[in-house]
Amino acid sequence: GSEMCIRDSMRNIDTAMKKAYPKGFQKENIIYTELSNDKVMLFNYTSGTTGFSKGVMLTGNNLAGNVTFGIRTGLLKKGEKVLSFLPLAHAYGCAFDFLTATAVGTHVTLLGKTPSPKILMKAFEEVKPNLIITVPLVIEKIYKNVIQPLINKRSMKWALNIPLLDNQIYAQIRKKLIDALGGRFKEVIIGGAAMNPEVTDFFYKIKFPFT
């Protein structure tokens, strides 16, 4: 059946590749179909916040504009690492976690699992990404699970009301959060929706590197 054909193909793929590319598969062997950039290249789906999810028709220019922006602003550089956990069916994750990263030669690790705080923390520790691109919901969950239990302790609330000591504590919390996200990122970019003002205010207070 079809499964047997797939298994046979996988077993023979090395032999077939050597036969087709005796000098090895090189960048010159990659040939893309030439299409005008005003053609629809992709259907990306909205989150459905204003009703049912909608398929948005994106042209080559739409995608190229995002990638060009990412390259010109130096979001990512060749050899850096990215942990991709946003849906690639949405424009945000697709444009920056995948297309821009691929264009500049960034190493992309696909999470492949539902991004619960526990799974994300483990992945951040392993990958240590240089840039984190996310949505408010993910960051708010991390705040709820990592930060809130700490700052809601009675002793911590008391200490945060003492001048000078509060800044030292905020610095420690900032380091704890940065370390929890891999410790190597230059910035966390949060977009796609409005973030909880409580989380935003706290991040500004501890001088967390986000935008």
Feature-to-residue mapping (PLM):
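Short, small-residue-biased leader/transition segments that mark boundaries at the very start
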Residues: G1-I6
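Conserved pre-ATP/AMP-binding loop-to-beta segment of ANL
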Residues: Y21-Y45, F52, L75-K81
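Alpha-helix-centered segments that form part of catalytic cores
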Residues: N29, E34, I162-T200
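Short aromatic/basic micro-patch
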Residues: E34, M57, I133
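Conserved S/T- and glycine-rich ATP-binding loop of Class I adenylate-forming
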Residues: V40, T46-T49, V82, P87, ...
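Conserved AMP-binding A3 loop
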Residues: M41-V67
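Conserved G/P- and acidic residue-centered "switch" motifs that form tight phosphate/ATP-binding loops
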Residues: G48-T49, G105, G192
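Conserved AMP-binding/adenylation subdomain of ANL enzymes
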Residues: A64-K81, L88-R174, R184, K205-P209
